[in-house]
Amino acid sequence: MTNRPTILVFDSGLGGLSVLREVVRARPDAHYVYVADDAFFPYGHHSQEALIARVVPLMGELIAGHRPDLIVIACNTASVQTLAPLRAAYATPFVGTVPAIKPACAQSRTKRVSVLGTKATV
């Protein structure tokens, strides 16, 4: 029996499902957990302090409950506002969406890329 990695994909809503789809394409062998924090949606309306106070302990509960090998923060706002505190608080590796924008631009055939973001992101 092989040990399948667990990848947790986190977003403030359902927009991260497109990120989940691409991660599944890249790692079809993994076990996936998708978490949408719709109770605090939309993240772009909250201060960085409020997001950190919400997301960091919530992530601790998710790590304890699911034991992921990798966490993908599929929310641009959460990536920009909470990624550094999450990495400082937990040993589990985190991947954000914002760093992925540069390679996406480089791979664009048309060299036109749209980025949707909240005031807290852009």
Describe the function of each predicted region.
Residues M1-V122:
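Non-catalytic structural scaffold of enzyme domains
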